[in-house]
């Protein structure tokens, strides 16, 4: 049996631009793509923390070191400059791979510079 698990996550990145008439996709700073192990043209899920929108598109390379997160094409209607996003990818794993898998997590500051690469997601405590 295969299961679909979180492969990588850019946590709380900030939208730097929205280009409605660009040919589509989401441009992401190459440093962030590499840190999260997201490849060009890979499907990504985007969750907008500000407005609750959730949508899928694909990643393209943004200028390295720029902190760019550009939501493009029709998806630009689902985000605004300054919005906080979670960008995630998923992959299928068999049972043995699942036991060994750890997602690539990338935490950033307000300029989308990498501040932490945590080893996992901690157990959530009850209130």
UniProtKB/Swiss-Prot annotation:
Domain of life: Bacteria
An annotated GO cellular component: cytosol
Any one GO molecular-function label of the UniProt entry: aspartate 1-decarboxylase activity
Binding site for substrate: 57, 73-75
Required cofactor(s): pyruvate
Pfam families cross-referenced by the UniProt entry: Asp_decarbox
Gene Ontology BP, a term: pantothenate biosynthetic process
Principal place of residence: cytoplasm
Keywords: Autocatalytic cleavage, Cytoplasm, Decarboxylase, Lyase, Pantothenate biosynthesis, Pyruvate, Schiff base, Zymogen
InterPro entries in the cross-refs: Asp_de-COase-like_dom_sf (IPR009010), Asp_decarbox (IPR003190)
Catalytic residues, chain numbering: 25 (schiff-base intermediate with substrate), 58 (proton donor)
List of residues that carry Pyruvic acid (Ser): 25
Enzyme class, first EC level, given as a word: lyase
EC numbers: 4.1.1.11
Cofactor, free-text remark: Binds 1 pyruvoyl group covalently per subunit.
Compartments reported by the entry: Cytoplasm
Changes after translation: Is synthesized initially as an inactive proenzyme, which is activated by self-cleavage at a specific serine bond to produce a beta-subunit with a hydroxyl group at its C-terminus and an alpha-subunit with a pyruvoyl group at its N-terminus.
Function: Catalyzes the pyruvoyl-dependent decarboxylation of aspartate to produce beta-alanine.
Complex and partners: Heterooctamer of four alpha and four beta subunits.
Protein family according to the UniProt entry: Belongs to the PanD family.
Protein name: Aspartate 1-decarboxylase
Upper taxonomic lineage: Bacteria, Pseudomonadati, Pseudomonadota, Betaproteobacteria, Neisseriales
